[in-house]
């Protein structure tokens, strides 16, 4: 319900809201019972930060073996530190490198409780909420995207509720391992 409510106040997104409502009407005309459900807005806002925290930490941990000695690309560097640095930097995009840096920070001993373990708690809260939905309903129908694709030079406030919820709610499936399908 909250995901659709955020969309409905924005004139630019009226077409998406109307298309989504048409899909709901079509489902109902096919005999499906459709009910709006609510999720705590704070949990919806926490999806993206929790997802980024956990995924960056896991990416860093899962790729820690890329030393250039046994795994990873081998280089002709002269010492082990240079070999490891080369194996962990060459061949990765800037985005992947940023994720590794963020993941390393998250996994540092002094940050694990505050960042990683709290993100895992948030993930459990979200999946617990979803599991409660699935005790009562067979599935959830959500908009697949918040808006049409933005222009390359469009500014986007990545800390706004709209961004944190509308562009990232599909990560819920990753948290709980729920099957999903996106239908155009």
Where are these regions (language model features)?
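Short beta-strand segments enriched in small/hydrophobic residues
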Residues: 1-9
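Conserved phosphate-binding/catalytic loops in two-lobed NTP-binding clefts
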Residues: 40
């Amino acid at each position: 319900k909250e995901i659709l409510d955020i969309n409905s106040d924005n004139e630019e997104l009226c077409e998406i809201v109307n298309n989504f409502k048409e899909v709901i009407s079509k489902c109902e005309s096919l005999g499906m019972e459709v009910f709006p459900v609510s999720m705590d807005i704070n949990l919806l806002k926490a999806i993206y930060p929790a997802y980024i925290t956990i995924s960056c930490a896991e990416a860093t941990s899962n790729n820690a073996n890329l030393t250039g000695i046994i795994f990873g690309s081998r280089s002709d560097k002269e010492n082990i530190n240079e070999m490891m640095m080369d194996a962990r930097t060459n061949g990765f995009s800037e985005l992947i490198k940023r994720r590794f840096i963020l993941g390393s920070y998250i996994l540092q001993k002094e940050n694990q409780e505050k960042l990683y373990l709290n993100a895992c708690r948030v993930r459990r809260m979200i999946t617990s909420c979803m599991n409660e939905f699935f005790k009562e309903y067979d599935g959830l129908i959500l908009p697949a995207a918040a808006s049409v694709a933005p222009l390359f030079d469009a500014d986007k406030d990545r800390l706004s509720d709209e961004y944190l919820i509308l562009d990232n709610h599909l990560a819920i499936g990753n948290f709980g391992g729920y099957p999903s399908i996106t239908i155009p």
